[in-house]
Amino acid sequence: QAIVEGKRSELVQSIWQAQEFRPDGLKSATDYRSDITIDEAASAITWPYSQLNEILRGLHRETLTTIAAGSGLGKSTFCKELIHHLLMHDQKVGVIALEESNKRTLLGLTGIHLSKNLLVEREQATDEEVLEGFDDLFGDRTCYLLDHFGSSDIDMICQRIRFMAVSLSISHVILDHISILVSAQEGDERRMLDAACTKLRTLCSELGISIIMVSHLKRPDGRGHEDGARVSL
């Protein structure tokens, strides 16, 4: 057709300047040459606990970390300690706490900053002390929380996480907890959990963020996990 239309030079040029075609997702090993010497362990943010750092060698980007334990054993408290630790190390944090109000989350974080358990004994600090601690913790640090009530759809949660990472430069997202996202939906809970985790893990790699995800353990027959039941993985 090009020859018929007198476009012989354009045809020759298109042949000699043709670019290599490669389907999406296929890369040559040489494409990773500049990445191979990067020490991911050396660039990782630490956990607030030394034993975790020894085992996990830090908190890495592009990872999905699951926190699992029985009811009432401190999963949410652990997450608050982690959030405070990340903020104190100048990390930008996103919080999606689906089981409690943002006010309670922020009061708990302020209490950690003041070394007081304000969620149990609010009278440990005056209103002025609480506000002073709040301003000292959040005044020049980045922490965004999802106003979530009425919102328990995994696709919506993924959209908000994407916005946090792209538009707000969030590096770490704490999701507490994944179980509530699938409990309100109909269908095979195991399949929905697998699908939700796949979407979250994909976001970690795509956006270069870490997601710390809390999960309840399925209650076995007899004793619960909080009473010493063994965990089956």
What residue spans do the PLM features occupy?
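Cytosolic-facing regulatory segments adjacent to core modules
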Residues: 54, 89-169, 183
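Catalytic P-loop NTPase motifs of RecA-like helicase/translocase cores
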Residues: 181-182, 220
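Conserved ATPase-coupling elements of RecA-like P-loop NTPase cores
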Residues: 182-189
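The Walker A/P-loop phosphate-binding site
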Residues: 16-116, 135, 143
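Phosphate-binding/switch region of NTP-binding enzymes
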Residues: 53, 108, 191-233
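Accessory, often N-terminal, substrate/partner-engagement and coupling regions
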Residues: 1-21
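Conserved Walker B
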Residues: 178
